Amino acid sequence: MTRMVQCVRLGREAEGLPRPPYPGELGKRIYENVSKEAWQEWLRHQTMLINEYRLTPVEPRARQFLEKEMENFFFGDGSSAPPDYQPE
């Protein structure tokens, strides 16, 4: 049976994630409140952030930045693209 969540990003009930996608309390919060569809949106947005800011995800500062952006994306005012970002 598919697990459903009230997705904070989409504002509606949708299919939930199969397991927490991130460690710790933030991962648990995402698991309980974010749908698969919204998680896929985040992955696309995160890829854009990594590319545009030329981040190296294994570096602690980059991980901290991405974690903050992830929390804003789902539970804050959102995460925006860099000022000069031009989608293709």
From Swiss-Prot:
Keyword Ligase: no
Keywords (A to Z) from UniProt: Iron
Gene Ontology molecular-function annotations: iron ion binding
Gene Ontology cellular-component annotations: cytosol
Keyword match Chaperone: no
InterPro entries xref list: Fe_traffick_prot_YggX, Fe_traffick_prot_YggX_sf
GO BP field: cellular response to oxidative stress
Protein family according to the UniProt entry: Belongs to the Fe(2+)-trafficking protein family.
Function: Could be a mediator in iron transactions between iron acquisition and iron-requiring processes, such as synthesis and/or repair of Fe-S clusters in biosynthetic enzymes.
Protein name listed in UniProt: Probable Fe(2+)-trafficking protein
